[in-house]
Structure formats: C-alpha cells, structure tokens
Amino acid sequence: MTAVTAASGTAVPRPIDRWLDEHGEGLVALRRNLHAHPELSGDEQATTDLVYERLQLAGLEARRLAVGTGLVCDIVPTGSAAGFEGGLALRADLDALAMADEKDVAYRSQVPGVSHACGHDVHTAIVLGTALYFAHHRDELPGPVRFIFQPAEERVPGGALDVVSDGGLAGVAAIVGLHCEPKLDVGTIGLRAGAISSAADMAVIGLSGPGGHTARPELTVDLVGLAAKVVTELPGRVAAAVAHIDHDHAALVKVVFGSLHAGDAANVIPTHGAIKASIRTPSLAVWDVLADVFERELHSIVAGSGAVVDLDYTHGVPPVVNDRAVTHIVGEAAAAALGASCVEEVQQSWGGDDFAWFTREVPGAYVRLGVRDPHGPTLDLHAGHFDVDERSIAIGVQLLTATVERFFAGPAEA
C-alpha cells in the first residue's frame, strides 16, 4: 500500500512502516466492510462486535459500554505495574448517518437510507489499526493508552457523554481524536489550538391551526405561508439579536433548516406543519443565550397569526476547544512522522462534534485528517457521494502511533 508521507522514503523503514506494509490493505478492507454495513446512532451492535472481535484476536481485553454499544480498550506497557494513570486516550466514533449512499462502488452501503457519509468508518479503522499495532509492539509502548470506540456522535447531545458517565476517562491525562477533512488533500494534517469547531443545537418547530380551503385563507391560518415566513425571517432575526454579544467572530450564528413539511394537497390548508433546524455558533457566550433568543424570535414571528407554536429545542454540544500543549504535541508528532510540510493550521469550523465533552473533562486535541484525492473532486461530509482517499487510513495510523510516542516523551516545547 502506498502512503502519501514525507517519511515514507527514509532509508531505514520504521516498525510502523513495516507493519503497515503488511497490514495496511487489511485496514482498508476493514473500512470497506464498515462502510458497506453502516449503523445508526445507538444501534452500532455489529460495528461494536466487529471491533471487539478484532481486539480479542490480537490478545486485547475490551469493555463494552453500559449503553450497549461502543467499547473501551486499554493497553499498558509490557511489565507495567502502575495501572492506567496518566494515560493517553485515542477516540473513534462508530455511527453512520440516516441518508442514502449514492456512490457506485463495490463497498457501497448495503443498508437502505443509511451511510457512512461522515467518515466514521475511517476513524474506526485508524484507531483500531493503532490498537492492533501496539498489541503486537508492546515493547515500543511508552505509556498506557486507552482506545475509545464511541457510539452516537451524530445524536445530540452525543454518545461522548455516555463514555464519560461510564468512567471512560478515568486515569486519562489527555485525549486525541481525528476527523476526516475533505477540504484537505490526503497527507495533510490540520491543527488549531483553541476552539476548532462550533456549538451545535437542534430545534423542531411545530405549527398548528384549524386548517381549511385554499380558496378562503382569510378564514383560517395559512400554515404553509407561516412556515415559509419562519424559514425566511428567523435566521436574520436571531443573528441580529446576538450581534452585540461577541465581537471576536465575523459571524456569530447560523440557523439552517434541514426539513419542512406541511400538508399534502394543493387545495387544502393543513392543520399542522413541522420544521427542523440546526443552530450553530462559534461563541460560547452566544451559545449560553441562544436557546432563549431562538424561542423569543420564533414567537415574535408567529404572534398574531392565530397559529399555535410548539418548540422542542435541544441544547447540543459546545465548541471543541483544543488544548495548546496537546495540540503542539500532535503537531510535533505529525512533523516527525509525515514531514513538517504536511502540517497546516486550520480555521474554526461551523461543524459540531461531541468530542467537545471530552475536552471539557481533560486536555485534548481534535485533529483534521486530509482525505481528499488531489486529482479528484472535493466530496463534502454529509453528502451522498462522500468518499475518501483510502491512503489516509495508513497516514492516520502513522500519526496516532507517533502521537503516542511523542506524548510520553515529555513536555512539548511551545
């Protein structure tokens, strides 16, 4: 398997390079197996079983989470009697999305309406590959490492909270996670100290009225028209209401609608409408008031229409805030394993990830892994044709093994 790394041409292959030469294609096959058999948040039974079995075959003990899906696995150095204290955790998320896989490939999803369009299959293959490497190279392991295979990242407020409540961070001194980044070419590692993602909330808006004939909308509540008004006016109103709170960001909030449904017939005004929205902000100060602002502005739009509004607002995940020292360690590891030119500073994104709950408990680094084929199209996350350059799997394993080695080597020089 050919990896895109600056270090691949060194005269003396490293142990991880030799291991990937032997096992890299197996990791790609594993990823394709996961890709073809995706499971939704909380339903990752087969995925959990597969990871558990692979760990067992390597002589490792894993513990399933109390929620039924997901697991953790500790590896400690040979001869260590200290137990798991001061360890490094590496996290992968297991779940897929409720959307169709539109690719024409052999490993296309075999589950209708479910696909790995966010790269969690890649994350799982990388973290599992790193665990399998250290299972056979314990003599190279400088300290205890916990491998976290987390369920339900896509379900607000996220399965990371289940890991935390299940003691998944006990004894952990720092945590590192990576995520596929289709805007970066394969072989590129994106890093950022401080906030690297945004807070992400969700809302379901219900609108109801008496219904009636479209010939006489003045005698009832025009729910379709009202829903359209909510969709067109609410984003601007919310943005204006929070504009004074934080002056450190060019934009403070995005309200984007993913679903709108009201009625089925052209000549019938419906009695019910439903709107689903995501609400995102890069600012913690804005996030603290966002639910109240959203509700107030929604009711302001609906007021006087005669409709009844029902709001189910879910406070989701905060921004992921990367620890400067841990991020520096990952950067040094990436430069050593892949070459300094492979490391790139990235901007804070509007995406959200429940990895944020981990970084509220222990110092951590959330890393963006380039997966774009330089000669192919850019395929965005959560899109039906999303796919990755599979050379990124070996690169991810190289990065994480180097991060483990660098983490236990001592304090980073900032």
Q: Where is each model-derived feature located?
A:
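Metal-dependent amide/peptide-bond hydrolase catalytic core
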Residues: 1-7, 228-414
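Acidic/His- and Gly-rich active-site-bordering loop/insert found
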Residues: 4-116, 121, 125-143
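General structural feature for long, well-ordered alpha-helical segments within catalytic domains
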Residues: 12, 23-26, 30, 43-54, ...
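Divalent metal-coordination and catalytic microenvironments
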Residues: 34, 90, 120, 147, ...
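Active-site beta-loop-alpha junctions enriched in small/polar residues
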Residues: 39, 93-95, 152-154, 181, ...
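Histidine/acidic-residue-rich, glycine-tolerant segments that coordinate divalent metal ions
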Residues: 72, 97-99, 103-115, 121-122, ...
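Non-cysteine beta-strand/loop elements that form the S-adenosyl-L-methionine
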Residues: 89-91, 100, 203-205, 366-372
